[in-house]
From Swiss-Prot:
InterPro entries per record: Ion_transpt_RnfA/RsxA, NqrDE/RnfAE, NqrDE/RnfAE_oxidrdctase
Alphabetized UniProt keyword annotations: Cell inner membrane, Cell membrane, Electron transport, Membrane, Translocase, Transmembrane, Transmembrane helix, Transport
Gene that specifies this protein: rsxA
Main EC class the enzyme belongs to: translocase
Topology term for the membrane: Multi-pass membrane protein
Protein name per Swiss-Prot or TrEMBL: Ion-translocating oxidoreductase complex subunit A
UniProt record similarity statement: Belongs to the NqrDE/RnfAE family.
Length: 193
């Protein structure tokens, strides 16, 4: 049980996918202008990353390894992610049309989010079992969502702040992301994996 807690805390805070591994930067910068959109994208990404981790582990363990087709791993995982994203898109469209309109093009772009593919590939490379894979996918997504929501809240405050003209827009956003990354480095000694 302690191992699973350490995996969760380590993935969310210490080895955050956005601020430490630099995966998922496109939606991190693109969808984080409004808190509402960032929260919706975080929830959708959490669902996709968790489900994609589970499906990728199952396909790798039950199909690719027994048939000695591990060279098709990346292609198979991309296809799995595409199917999971389409399923998520249908669910979001039915349950929350407002969120579906807010996310716009970013929802299908979860397919190309390198964090989703990264979590599937890292699960295999780290040798996780089924429960660890599911938890790792969920933890990575929680860390991604946490950083997105924090960053969106900061960006909303910066939008009304008195920022010097050369730093407005993406410049201050990148500086803020760098400062967030430094803040998360404070967790680096918390968990040793």
């Amino acid at each position: 049980m302690t191992d699973y807690l350490l995996l969760f805390v380590g993935t969310v805070l210490v080895n955050n996918f956005v601020l430490v591994k630099f995966l998922g930067l496109c939606p991190f910068m693109g969808v984080s202008k409004k808190l509402e959109t960032a929260m919706g994208m975080g929830l959708a990404t959490t669902f996709v990353m968790t489900l994609a981790s589970i499906c990728a582990w199952l396909i790798d363990t039950w199909i690719l390894i027994p048939l000695n087709l591990i060279y098709l791993r990346t292609m198979a995982f991309i296809l799995v992610i595409a199917v999971v994203v389409q399923f998520t898109e249908m669910v979001v469209r039915k349950t929350s049309p407002v969120l579906y309109r807010l996310l716009g093009i970013f929802l299908p772009l979860i397919t190309t989010n390198c964090a989703v593919l990264g979590v599937a590939l890292l699960n295999i490379n780290l040798g996780h079992n089924f429960l660890q894979s599911a938890l790792y996918g969920f933890s990575a997504a929680v860390g991604f969502s946490l950083v997105m929501v924090l960053f969106a809240a900061i960006r909303e405050r910066l939008a009304v702040a008195d920022v010097p003209a050369p730093f407005r827009g993406n410049a201050i956003a990148l500086i803020t992301a760098g400062l967030m990354s430094l803040a998360f480095m404070g967790f680096s000694g918390l968990v040793k994996l």
